[in-house]
Each structure stands twice: as structure tokens, then as C-alpha cells.
Amino acid sequence: MNKKYFNLKIIYISFLLISSISFNFYYGYLGVFPIDSFLIYNAGYNVLNGFHPFKDYWSITGPLLDYIQFIFFLLFDVNWFSYVLHAAIINFIITIFSFYFFIKMGLNISFSFIYSLCISILAYPLIGTPFVDIHAVIFSLISVSLMNLGIFYKKNNFFYYSAILIILSFFSKQIPSAYILLSQILILLFYIYACNKKNYKPLINYLMIIFLSFIFILVFFFINDIPIKNFIVQYILYPASIGSERTLELSFTFNKIIGQFKFIYLSLLPILGVILILLKKKIKNIEITRDLIILISTIIVSLIFIYCQMITRNQILIFFLIPYYLAISQIYTTKYWNRKSVLPIILILLLVSTAKYHQRFNNEKKFMDLDGYDINLVLNSKVIDSTLSGLKWISLDFIDEPDKEIKLIKNTKEFLLNDIENKIYITDYQFFQSITKNDNISPNKWYDALSIPSEKNKYFANYKLFFLESLKKQQIDNIYFISLERKEEIFINSVIDNKKCLNFEKINKILTKFIFKNCKI
């Protein structure tokens, strides 16, 4: 490596570090979508206080993020800075890894920098705070890339790393990792048969790491007294029942399947073109076969990402895949389809898609449903609590009156601080646990309607028992609902048989107090 190239690489890496961190911090401090924005904040705080997912609170997603956030809170204290820093570091990881990956695959260093810069803009800044789906997609993408490097260079160490990353993805969220793991096993089998002289060592290494990872998890559960049954019900069986229902309910309209993912499909078209060129070649040597495996696996994994995005029903968060696929398109069209017209089209797609989704999702905050918000109305959340200092508060429910929402939150905080009885909070504002220093923990990690089984679901009995045992163990006197939306029907009435024992009092527009101490469990 000559000195000029080395210096250029250092400059690019430094710029990518600054861009990935600064973009994420700016947008991570702008606006909130309470049900998503504060989910991991409270989970990290719970782990910091000695509580664990599956054991102390019902959790259907993202245990890895709980523990990562615990580390950030441990190192940098419980505050919004350490929360956004978590997401910013992950944004930097996918950015710098992409830069490394593109170079290793043969792309010019300057083009590698440009594509990676676009990834840094589109990946985590759309929400800016830790989010299970984004962690899962990022870890899965790195895993797939590492496997492609293993196939490209015929080096087994990449298969080890690929397995580790797919496990990290799985413990961020069950999908897309579960599907990608299966696809990787099939890809490895084909690679072994076609290119590796039927040497099964890559597959053995991959599966060995998967096995050892689960052994490590079991040991961790044993040390922390986390029941395996709870993990299986909460993280495997119940979410699988939701997934099957959502698959059956999928709407196969043009916009759902094609329209909303059009730029992703366009970024894949050059890859499909190269695949067709390679399939038509009469003589297929090891190099061509290897490249075919990499390109076909890229298409398969992209379809998995799109399918998983469709069944999650979130706003679309995978647009950062566009610069990734366009980079791969440039690598292989340059190698096999060297037409001067292709590269300009790829670069135009890159610039248009990056500008479009940066404006829509970062600036206009579409992911948080804040389309049309007035940035002049945002308020510093320091008035709520010093730990939220710098967060520019505005949310969907009070999009034109954030001052009213903050006033209600401050009033609620004051009321809760004056209640010295044992209490839990059921709320999307999941910072109340920390700002009131409440020692009791809600039995739920999350308050989305699908986070717990409905009464018709076969795992409802498991949830009901878990919820009531938690209240009994903690000797809970009061249950507070902090929300505009009435959630007691889902989170209380369904699990309390004798509802007459519950007395409630409406404190303010967002706060309702349920007196639970007279209920016998």
C-alpha cells in the first residue's frame, strides 16, 4: 500500500466517522415517536437495575439491544446522549464495514467512499435512536457480506464471523435473520458442491459457531436465572404465531410489492443483468461460478429483506440497501458488462434515491409520522428532565402543540413523584421509570397491541400468569396508564378476572390511576 493511497484511506475513514456519527446525532435529537423512540431506553435502564428480559419483563423482541444499551448507560450514565450514541455507533459500523467490503470486492476506493457515505445518511438517521429492526437488518447485511467475502477469497475465517453476526441479528429481532440463516446454509452447500471440491469445512465452521453461540446463551440464561421456557414462549412461539397471521393478511397490491420498493428493485436490475450474462456463458470456470453464487445470494437476501419489511408493518427502513446494491452493481457490471452508459445510470440512481429518502425520512421525519411538522415549534426536553437535555421535542399526537404535551408530562411526573406506594407504569413514554427513579418494573417491555397475546391466542394463558405473578411479587398498589390512547382494555381488563376490585381515577388528559391493591391474585 503506497503512502498516497494510505493517506487517502485515512481521510475517507475520518470523514465517514464524522458523517455517520453527526448525521445520526442531529436526527436522533429531533422529534420523537414515543412507542418506538423510548422502547430501548427503558429496557436498558431495567437491565442497569438488575432486571432481565424474559425473566422480569415480557419481551418479544430485541434482548440484545437491552444489554447493549445497558453498557452505554453504565459508561455514559442514563441520558439521551448515551442513548443516541448507541445508534450512532451502529450507524458508523455499517458505514465503515461497507467501505471495507466494497474495497475488498474490488471497487475503487473513491467510489467505495461515495456509496458508504450514502449508507451513513440513509441507515440509522431516519430514527436516530436504537431500533430493533434496524439493528437486525444491519447485522444481517454484514453477515451476508462476510459470507460473500468467504466465498470470494475462499477463507474460512469469514464464515466464522458471518455466523456470529447472524446470531447478533437474531437476538436483535427474529427476522430477517431466521430466513437468512436458512438461505446461508443452502448457499454454502451449493458453494461447497460447485467451487470447493466438496470440502464441507466452511459449513461445519459456520454451524459450529451457531451451536456454540446458543450454548453461550444458555449459560448466560442459567447464570441469570432466566427460564428457558419463558424465552421459547416469548421470543419464538408467540412471535411465530403473529408472523403466520401477518403473512396470511398480506396485501399483494402493486404498491405494496413494487411501488414502495421501486428504487431497491432498480438498484438490483444491473445485478440481474450480470446474472443473465454469466448464465449464458458456455464455459463457466470457478471464478464465474463463484461470482454467480454471490450475485444470486444477493438477490435472494434482498427479497428476504423486502418480505420481512412487508410483514413488520413499520414505515420502510431498508432504503439504505439501495447504495449497497448499487455498489455491488458497479463492481460486477464493470467486470462483466463494461458499457459506458451503465455507470452514469447507477450514479444517477444513487444520487436521486439518497436525496429523495434523506429529505423524506430524515428531514421530514416520515418514519415517525411527523410529515408536515413545523421545526420552529420544537422544544428542548430539558424542561421535562435534565437527562433528556437537548432532545428537540415534537410528537404526532401534539404535532401543533408540543408545549401542551410537555406541560402534561411535567404534571404527570410531579404526580408520580408524590406517590410513594408500589407502582408500575403502562406507557409509551418509557422514560418515566428513570426520571421518577421507580424501583418497580412493568411486566411488559413494550405497549404495542401485538406485544402481548390476545385472549384468543393460545399463549395468552402464559402471558396472564407472567403478568399477575409480577404484580404479586412486587406487591403493586397502583397501575398508571400514561397515554392519550386507552390501553387498559388490552393491558389490564384482559388479565384481571374480577374487574370490580379496580378503582380508577383520571388525573389529567394523559394520566389515569388504577388502584390495584384491593385486588386478590
Descriptions of predicted regions:
Residues 17, 262-291, 326-332:
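Hydrophobic, aromatic-rich transmembrane alpha-helices
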Residues 3, 179-212, 327, 333-335:
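Perimembrane helix-loop-helix junctions
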Residues 104-106, 141-161, 169, 195-197, ...:
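Membrane-interface transmembrane helices that cradle and orient dolichyl/undecaprenyl
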Residues 158-176, 180-185, 299-310:
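Membrane-interface alpha helices of multi-pass inner-membrane proteins
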Residues 28-43, 54-71, 78-81, 226-228:
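Extracytoplasmic catalytic/substrate-binding loops of multi-pass membrane glycan-assembly enzymes
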Residues 126-136:
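Short acidic/glycine- and proline-prone juxtamembrane loop motifs at membrane-interface regions
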Residues 362-367, 373-450, 477-487, 510:
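Short periplasmic/luminal acceptor-recognition loop of GT-C membrane glycosyltransferases, typified by
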Residues 96-124, 154-157:
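Transmembrane-helix signature of polytopic, membrane-embedded enzymes
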